[in-house]
């Protein structure tokens, strides 16, 4: 049965495909979309950026032409795109897929996006830029220990849940209490309901062996350089955006910008980019294991069997 034949029938549960970078998620999602009349919805926080097609390994234009793809490259790099903004866009994509009778397939490696999708999201108001910038300046000037002590004095509950390695989360908690007068924990308790309740999705986490994954990460980074990643980063750097913006911190971008400034050789920048990506993959394993235990862990060589079961389930649910 062709994609066109199945693409308009009613669909049951959504499918969530997660995993570390370079684990083969995109290929699996495309195969499932073709087999089950699906639409691919991005759940990767870096692949949303228009400026970063190559360095973030977004699907190719040829793949995008085969089945509908949503939430890829739809945000300018100058935007500090939040999880809340993604959830809003994802809700529209999910509604559109269901209206067309297509299987919604969420794919990516950003754990917070999947957590928001399946467990809801807190309703913290937007933090004024001046508050955020002031907290960041204090972090750089005084260090993380001083910032954590400040948080402990103002929001001991939040501080008690964070250690000194959580620089970003410490700063975030302090921003929230300064801007709103309320603890981040209180805001979390008033969160939005999930887009996908527990019984409304199938979820898989692709888990290659570490050695295999790291080899794939290294090879893919080199392939991205060969495909023009350096020129892409050069165009991004020419915009002179705030280096703290998410797009400016995508894996490989800071090191390649340092190369363009003459601070690193290309080999040195590539070595840093590969290492940063491997470290991120390691953190992804840890995060999903502890935060999203409902995901079924599958080795890449077992993925086809899982995919066949999902196709059969989609047909039964539709």
From Swiss-Prot:
Biological process terms in GO annotation: tRNA modification
Source organism superkingdom: Bacteria
Known catalytic reactions: adenosine(37) in tRNA + dimethylallyl diphosphate = N(6)-dimethylallyladenosine(37) in tRNA + diphosphate
Binding site for substrate: 21-26
Enzyme kind, highest EC tier: transferase
Interaction with substrate tRNA: annotated span: 44-47
Entry binding sites for ATP: 19-26
Record-annotated site: Interaction with substrate tRNA: 110, 132
Cofactor(s) the protein needs: Mg(2+)
EC number(s) recorded for this UniProt protein: 2.5.1.75
Protein name, UniProt field: tRNA dimethylallyltransferase
Organism (species): Bradyrhizobium diazoefficiens (strain JCM 10833 / BCRC 13528 / IAM 13628 / NBRC 14792 / USDA 110)
Gene from which the chain derives: miaA
């Amino acid at each position: 049965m062709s994609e066109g034949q199945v693409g308009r029938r009613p669909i049951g549960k959504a499918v969530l495909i997660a995993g570390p970078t370079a684990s083969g998620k995109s290929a699996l999602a495309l195969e499932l979309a073709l087999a089950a009349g699906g639409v691919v919805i991005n759940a990767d926080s870096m692949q949303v950026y228009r400026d970063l097609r190559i360095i973030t390994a977004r699907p190719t234009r040829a793949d995008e032409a085969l089945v509908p793809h949503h939430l890829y490259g739809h945000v300018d790099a100058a935007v500090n795109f939040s999880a809340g903004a993604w959830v809003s866009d994802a809700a529209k994509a999910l509604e559109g897929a269901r209206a067309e009778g297509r299987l919604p397939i969420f794919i990516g490696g950003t754990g917070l996006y999947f957590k928001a999708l399946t467990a809801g999201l807190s309703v913290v108001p937007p933090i004024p830029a001046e508050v955020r910038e002031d907290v960041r300046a204090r972090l750089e000037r005084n260090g993380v220990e001083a910032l954590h002590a400040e948080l402990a004095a103002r929001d001991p509950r939040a501080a008690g849940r964070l250690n000194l390695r959580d620089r970003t989360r410490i700063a975030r908690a302090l921003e929230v209490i300064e801007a709103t007068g309320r603890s981040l924990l209180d805001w979390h308790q008033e969160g939005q309901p999930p887009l996908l309740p527990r019984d409304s999705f199938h979820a898989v986490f692709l888990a290659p062996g570490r050695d295999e994954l790291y080899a794939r990460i290294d090879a893919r980074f080199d392939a991205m350089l060969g495909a023009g990643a350096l020129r892409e980063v050069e165009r991004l750097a020419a915009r002179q955006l705030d280096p703290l913006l998410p797009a400016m911190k995508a894996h490989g971008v800071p090191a390649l910008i340092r190369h363009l400034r003459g601070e690193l050789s290309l080999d040195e920048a590539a070595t840093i980019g590969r290492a940063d990506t491997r470290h991120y993959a390691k953190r992804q394993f840890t995060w999903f294991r502890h935060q999203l235990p409902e995901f079924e862990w599958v080795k890449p060589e077992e993925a086809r069997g899982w995919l066949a079961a999902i196709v059969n389930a989609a047909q039964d649910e539709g």
